[in-house]
């Protein structure tokens, strides 16, 4: 009887929903997992999962320069794993880096998870050092996605694509094959 009781308690503990923390780097995920313990699952996105396709412009110029995003080739498995974990979780904590790229990564992942499991709360957390105190403080004070940072990253990405896709072919034709043009590659 005592053994059955222990097994039941163990099963109840294992069935408790955990909080999913998503970071960009697998090394960070491993370290953070040690600090947060058994109530959390920490996964890595391995950086961007969503971007513009490489094979075409993918900027809808007639619709306010709206980008046409896709899941990056080879990243669907990671995205599906994150969505699967999110469905089983109590909440999702998006902990990508605190910069434009990180905010964009968090925004894209949040949208994909929200589409797959709308009932799971999704929060954005930010920390600037990987310590137990910094992580706990970030978890206690979640914030919304900074849409201004997301829009800044989107604008940069759209400009890069427009400049590169339109000017690079001209360079190949007029100067030399293999040259490329970009927002930060050319003299201002």
Question: Which role does the model predict for each range below?
Answer:
Residues 1-157, 163-166, 171, 186-187:
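Intrinsically disordered, low-complexity regulatory segments
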Residues 176-188:
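Extended, Lys/Arg-enriched charged tracts that mediate electrostatic binding to polyanionic substrates
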């Amino acid at each position: 009887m005592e053994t059955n009781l222990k097994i039941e308690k163990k099963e109840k503990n294992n069935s408790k929903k955990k909080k999913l923390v998503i970071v960009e780097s697998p090394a960070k995920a491993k370290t953070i997992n040690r600090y947060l313990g058994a109530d959390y699952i920490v996964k890595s996105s391995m950086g961007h999962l969503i971007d513009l396709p490489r094979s075409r412009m993918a900027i809808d110029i007639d619709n306010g320069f709206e980008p046409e995003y896709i899941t990056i080739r080879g990243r669907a498995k990671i995205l599906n794993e994150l969505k699967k974990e999110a469905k089983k979780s109590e909440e999702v904590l998006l902990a990508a880096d605190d910069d434009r790229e990180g905010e964009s990564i968090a925004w894209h992942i949040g949208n994909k998870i929200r589409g797959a499991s709308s009932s799971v709360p999704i929060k954005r957390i930010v920390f600037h050092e990987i310590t137990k105190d910094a992580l706990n403080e970030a978890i206690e004070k979640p914030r919304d996605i900074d849409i201004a940072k997301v829009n800044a990253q989107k604008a940069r990405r759209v400009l890069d694509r427009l400049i590169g896709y339109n000017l690079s072919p001209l360079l190949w034709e007029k100067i030399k094959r293999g040259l490329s043009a970009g927002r930060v590659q050319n003299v201002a």
